[in-house]
C-alpha cells in the first residue's frame, strides 16, 4: 500500500521471496498441466474439478459451490464443465430445489479417468514438492499457505472473490 510519502516498496528480502514464489508457482502449474495433458489429456484445473466432484456426496455438487471450492470464476467453471461434458466425464442437471441452479455430476467415465490419472498426478506432486522438503518444511509450507489463503478470502457479501464473478 502507498502512503503520502509514496509506495511502501518491498525490501530486498521480500522481493527475493516474491520472485521465488512467482517462479515456483508458475513452474509448478506448468509441471502439473504438462503431466496431466500427457497422461490424461486434460489440464490441471479439469483434474481438480473432477477431484472436487469425486469427493462430493453422490459425486454431485451445485455449480456455484464447485466454483467456490475450485476458487475460479463462474464463467471459467462453465467453460470447463462444458469441455468435461463433451468428454463424457461430467454431466449437468437442473437443481431440484432451485430452478435457476445446476448441479455438476461426475459420470462413471469421469470416475474412471480420475482413477487412471491419479497415480501419475500424485507422483508429479510428490516429485515437485514433497520429495524436496523435509517434514518440518512441509508443516511450515502448509501453515504459510493456509494463512495466505485465509487472508485472500475476506468475509462479507461484498468481497470480490472469483466464484462471485
Regions found by a protein language model. Name each.
Residues 76, 80-83, 144:
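Residues within the DNA-recognition helix of helix-turn-helix
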Residues 28, 32, 70, 113, ...:
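Alpha-helical linker/hinge and terminal dimerization helices associated
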Residues 1-12, 135-165:
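C-terminal regulatory/oligomerization modules of transcriptional regulators
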Residues 19, 51, 115, 142:
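A cross-family signal for key residues in well-ordered alpha-helices
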Residues 1-40, 165:
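N-terminal leader segment of winged-helix/HTH proteins
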Residues 30-73, 160:
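N-terminal helix-turn-helix DNA-binding core of bacterial DNA-binding proteins
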Residues 39, 86-89, 151:
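Residue cluster at the C-terminal edge of the helix-turn-helix DNA-binding motif
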